[in-house]
């Protein structure tokens, strides 16, 4: 079996050294070249056709964002951004994802080059996962943008806690791009409340929700503890903790609760935990659960349970998934009412809500 050929792009010699050590400890991976800036990255990407590129953003001569844009235009390649775990780092990361990068790894706080080995396993998993991706080039090849302009918007003056459907969306690797294909396509008058469970660091989720809000007719924000679900509102679960939905006896308002339990959860927030909690607060036939691109099986079993109890479930197809792990598991377990490419999911949600 041929090895996964990786191009490392970083202006720090120490970071290039550490990344090479991390990647080459896996027998399935081969580092074919390194680049010190975006210009070298473009040249080596065109010359060597790597399977995966790891990309720094802040570099001399040509930055990572410019390099990503050029590479995705001329030789579409799975690109993983190595970003800072800061608000500024989050904003540039989301810009990189919009330009075509498939995923990111957030560098730990502190002396970055020394701490990069703390995320070694994440880097290895993501490189191997996106190398097999079929969705990266196909999504990039779609000419139309999911949005055309920013939509200025504030919280509705009169919150409406009654809604026809509850839309649950679970997603991991490749999630920001997939969500940009769905949420901006949903109309502002949608008679539904939306909850998104995205595997993402705590410092990233508020920035991501704000960015998604800029392009959406619906009101998008990071969920706060105790916040109510409302018609026309999209809540993004905070990173680093589990989100559950609860409703007090005799009160017809569903609220968000954050909890460190169950402790055995692998992912924080957990899709399974959030999806299962929805079954305790709302009639199953009012639930539309969507499982998108991601590694592993988080959310797959909850999809089975929602479908068995009368809810409607949609799994993203292999055609567009950056990593066809979570949706594939749901399909194989019988948890998908329907399988769709990501660009058809928003329209289908609108049909189901009607």
Swiss-Prot record:
Active site (record annotation): 172, 199, 298
Domain Response regulatory: from-to ranges: 5-122
Subcellular location: Cytoplasm
Top-rank taxon, per record: Bacteria
InterPro entries linked to this entry: CheB-like, CheB_C, CheY-like_superfamily, Sig_transdc_resp-reg_Me-estase, Sig_transdc_resp-reg_receiver
Entries under SUPFAM superfamilies matching the protein: CheY-like, Methylesterase CheB, C-terminal domain
Residues of the CheB-type methylesterase domain: 159-354
CDD domains, alphabetized: CheB_Rec, REC_CheB-like
Post-translational modification: Phosphorylated by CheA. Phosphorylation of the N-terminal regulatory domain activates the methylesterase activity.
Protein task: Involved in chemotaxis. Part of a chemotaxis signal transduction system that modulates chemotaxis in response to various stimuli. Catalyzes the demethylation of specific methylglutamate residues introduced into the chemoreceptors (methyl-accepting chemotaxis proteins or MCP) by CheR. Also mediates the irreversible deamidation of specific glutamine residues to glutamic acid.
HAMAP family, sorted: CheB_chemtxs
Protein name in the entry: Protein-glutamate methylesterase/protein-glutamine glutaminase 2
Organism: Carboxydothermus hydrogenoformans (strain ATCC BAA-161 / DSM 6008 / Z-2901)
Lineage start: Bacteria, Bacillati, Bacillota, Clostridia, Thermoanaerobacterales
